[in-house]
Amino acid sequence: MNTKIILAVVLAIIVVAAWAVNAHRNKGFKTVSPEEFGQIIGDTATVQLLDVRTKEEYEEGHIADALLVDFYSYNFEEQAAAKLSKEKAVAVYCRSGRRSASAAQKLVKLGYEVINLDGGILAWQRAKN
């Protein structure tokens, strides 16, 4: 009987762990490599590019044609809604990919289709060199 209980507990732990991993992966947006991101943003008819870094970071260098909405601003969602169309996907990036992943989650909740740059502009710059 103890073997059955232990087996049931182990099975329950595996099921919960698998669910947690799947929930983490299914964030509502896609994260892509710099190479794939470059292909995606080339289609400006269907994609809009969003930089969610600070103004200072943006001014130090950004991907051409990127709109700026600072993720740390108190009204990020309002600014994003004012600048972005829900008719086009949003390709989002930041410095390292963390901020843009958080921004992507917020944008998905607002109804946008979102593509996140894995590794941010740092990975983008490494891929271009």
Q: Where are the regions a protein language model picked out?
A:
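Rhodanese-like catalytic fold shared by cysteine-dependent sulfurtransferases
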Residues: 2-40, 47, 55-89, 98-129
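Short, surface-exposed ligand- or partner-binding patches at beta-edge/loop junctions that are enriched
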Residues: 93
